[in-house]
Amino acid sequence: MYLTASSSASSSIIRAASSRSSSLFSFRSVLSPSVSSTSPSSLLARRSFGTISPAFRRWSHSFHSKPSPFRFTSQIRAVSPVLDRLQRTFSSMASEHPFKGIFTTLPKPGGGEFGKFYSLPALNDPRVDKLPYSIRILLESAIRNCDNFQVTKEDVEKIIDWEKTSPKQVEIPFKPARVLLQDFTGVPAVVDLACMRDAMNKLGSDSNKINPLVPVDLVIDHSVQVDVARSENAVQANMELEFQRNKERFAFLKWGSTAFQNMLVVPPGSGIVHQVNLEYLGRVVFNTKGLLYPDSVVGTDSHTTMIDGLGVAGWGVGGIEAEATMLGQPMSMVLPGVVGFKLAGKMRNGVTATDLVLTVTQMLRKHGVVGKFVEFYGNGMSGLSLADRATIANMSPEYGATMGFFPVDHVTLQYLKLTGRSDETVAMIEAYLRANNMFVDYNEPQQDRVYSSYLELNLDDVEPCISGPKRPHDRVTLKEMKADWHSCLDSKVGFKGFAIPKEAQEKVVNFSFDGQPAELKHGSVVIAAITSCTNTSNPSVMLGAGLVAKKACDLGLQVKPWIKTSLAPGSGVVTKYLLKSGLQEYLNEQGFNIVGYGCTTCIGNSGEINESVGAAITENDIVAAAVLSGNRNFEGRVHPLTRANYLASPPLVVAYALAGTVNIDFETEPIGKGKNGKDVFLRDIWPTTEEIAEVVQSSVLPDMFRATYESITKGNPMWNKLSVPENTLYSWDPNSTYIHEPPYFKDMTMDPPGPHNVKDAYCLLNFGDSITTDHISPAGNIQKDSPAAKFLMERGVDRKDFNSYGSRRGNDEIMARGTFANIRIVNKLMNGEVGPKTVHIPSGEKLSVFDAAMRYKSSGEDTIILAGAEYGSGSSRDWAAKGPMLQGVKAVIAKSFERIHRSNLVGMGIIPLCFKSGEDADTLGLTGHERYTIHLPTDISEIRPGQDVTVTTDNGKSFTCTVRFDTEVELAYFNHGGILPYVIRNLSKQ
């Protein structure tokens, strides 16, 4: 039988709660004794599939915040054979919600009610009043979803007692309100869901059980490339090429939007996922059939954190973790510490939000916030616009935090109105958050909140700056930039070094560009891109860039024609206000024509640079530069030929494009010669804060947001012409090079395989620090001599049609070949040789990483990876775990892991191990030429989260590592060979 949303047990919860006793009592009186969720029998049961079943969210999801051509209304039918089995047990739980005593009505001013909600103040517990606002969202979710089954009263108590429990690394379940996807990560997610349906079929179960049970929004934004720039026709030309390359992927996603319930797909050309989420999709407060609760979201993109600026709890997770969340599996997470970041004062004239976020990133990176929430507060908050806050929240992955959270205040409400949310919706949001003590009013005295640690920044101290040349947290002030650049040229190859000999540093390369003389030097800018949701969501810096362009035009400055300039807004709203202000005209004159609505250069979709420019760089070993308003600048990410990549505000992107080089001191050196040969300095073209505020006030209007988003799901003619089958099971084309059935569930049975042995494994790769997911699974161009290129050419794909690795993530055969294919990767086994190769230890041959991995795999040999600190930092890229798994990697031993990547490794059945503090491969004398045995118990009941394990080598070395299975649920996943097999077996048993 199936229960529809209207007939589900949730209605009985509401009915029972509405007749609750009017008396309010303390939290401790709500709790009743029950079996501990951490008892040995409970833990053992959790590791088998019989006890943990997915959550069945029974609320229908409707979004009423603004006029819209559609509603987010689920047509969910909860997968419910399990309810037949547990009906008698759950019937009493449904009518007797553990917290029915705090379920109350939120009245409307003037009569009526907004709905009902679980009241945190009604707990009458003083500990709640001191909780950080971000933790209150976790608390409300736990209370609302408490069923003493998936979420227990003990879990609720852990969160309430956060001050004492968070230092102990306790585990809690969390059930986000929705899931957010983009197409690079969304395609493999939908591929996995389709493959899971097939697996359910093969196991004799109902394939329709594989359906999202929470709202899923997928925005197609990662596919557009800057093939055409500096042209009025660039948007249309790039979109046509985008559809030519990605027609099959887009049709697959369109099929997914019809085959899977509760899934919305926003067509290409609409904007960047995080900006669309901020301006439109974000609810702040859900009103679902009269039940009010805070919006929360997990997304398959690490910059999902941008929504934290709106007061919505959100962060990035791996694709496989998101898939489990879609299917009702609660997320298991360690209750995080919260860093309180106090902002004081006000930014000086001419300083931008980008300067602020780069400063904050450097401070937090130094403080150490991995696995923690950061919550901003202080009197400096009142001077930050919502867009400024979103910029800071966006870069949470760059400073290492799970979230960079800004509680809702009056600035948030003003932004909601600006972006077209209805007055009634905003009134409901404010009333709910005030009633539940989740609203901050900086005009009122602030109650002290407890944080795990504290930081403070006086906004007066923020200086204009950029970050680079290879990492987002390597901030350089503008006044120090020239000296820092020369230091980078001098220093040995590393994060801040290129090792260019002194005698070669002033080299000038002359070449011909379109028949005109041109020249390049070390530091010459060849790409200047206003890109990324980080900054294009912020009208002040976008209009500031337009003002810089206007002043430059007025003074007679012009960007050199061989610099590839581009502007890619995160939503159509940006185009509207740039046109209304009249500033787009001047950006066009400087070459910053709009090229498309998507991520573009920020994720490596910068397109080709001119052949003559490329030849001048490669033939003369020039360290060319890219300057972009993005959030990441890791090696090889922006473009293969730009070894120096700097993050800057949009106005500075225009300024550096005008200067043509990063080798400049803007305070003392002119940008160029203007009219009549007069020197023009940065100060001559830099707008004042008042100038920017004036144009923002006159040009950014609510009607622009309404007009843009009323038509966002209608698509364009190319999207609407895509025809898709109506089948709920996907018909795999074995010859497709975009969509391929992955082998994850091949030969799968109902019996969990248990922990796998790692005995006498070879080291596939030996890495140093800061190996990113871009190194592990690049998203950009497919190099012509790579294993992936060979695979495509063997199947008749021309080089011009290779597309990017990111666009090929629906094909496991290509992605396995693209794993560790970054051309800038440094493997210690190669003794200084840079590139995607390794040594096959038994033969001593130098091979591509893929070829070596396949040789090990074909001979039945396990492999492991050695790594340094921050392994897997960067994008939340599940292929950085899927790829190694398909290559046969059984374990990664590192000094430390980035949060999302560690979770992804666990999700794919790979063992993450950490060296003990003060130790690493070098200090232990490990070269990677040894064979490794990991002495992990083969009985899952004998493994504990975070336990120590001994690793031995064939040459007699022995050392201790910490197993980074952090929770009991992760051990259950490991027992099943990964999270997806675990979910399939669970659903098949019901």
Swiss-Prot record:
Amino-acid positions noted as binding [4Fe-4S] cluster in the UniProt annotation, renumbered to this chain: 533, 599, 602
Keyword set includes Repeat: no
Phenotype of gene-disrupted mutants: Reduced cytosolic and mitochondrial aconitase (ACO) activities by 25 and 55 precent, respectively. Increased tolerance to oxidative stress mediated by paraquat, a superoxide-generating agent. Delayed early seedling growth, altered assimilation of acetate feeding and elevated citrate and malate levels.
Keywords, ordered alphabetically: 4Fe-4S, Cytoplasm, Glyoxylate bypass, Iron, Iron-sulfur, Lyase, Metal-binding, Mitochondrion, Phosphoprotein, Transit peptide, Tricarboxylic acid cycle
EC id: 4.2.1.3
Subcellular localization: Mitochondrion; Cytoplasm
Inducing stimuli: Transiently induced during germination.
Pathway recorded for this protein: Carbohydrate metabolism; tricarboxylic acid cycle; isocitrate from oxaloacetate: step 2/2
Pfam families given in the database record: Aconitase, Aconitase_C
Catalytic activity field: citrate = D-threo-isocitrate
Residues found modified as Phosphoserine: 91
Known cofactor(s): [4Fe-4S] cluster
UniProt: substrate binding residues: 182, 301-303, 632, 637, 795, 876-877
Enzyme class: lyase
Presequence range in chain numbering: 1-78
PROSITE patterns named among the record's database cross-references: ACONITASE_1, ACONITASE_2
Expression sites (tissue/organ): Major aconitase isoenzyme in young seedlings. Expressed in roots, leaves, stems and flowers, and, at low levels, in seeds.
GO biological process, one term: response to abscisic acid
Co-factor remark: Binds 1 [4Fe-4S] cluster per subunit.
Single annotated GO MF: copper ion binding
Statement: the UniProt record of this protein carries the keyword Oxidoreductase: no
Role, per record: Catalyzes the isomerization of citrate to isocitrate via cis-aconitate. Contributes to oxidative stress tolerance. Modulates cytosolic citrate metabolism during lipid mobilization. Required during seedling growth.
Family: Belongs to the aconitase/IPM isomerase family.
Description of how the protein assembles with itself and partners: Monomer. Interacts with B'GAMMA in the cytosol.
Name listed for the protein in its UniProt record: Aconitate hydratase 3, mitochondrial
Source species: Arabidopsis thaliana
Source taxonomy: Eukaryota, Viridiplantae, Streptophyta, Embryophyta, Tracheophyta
Gene that encodes the chain: ACO3
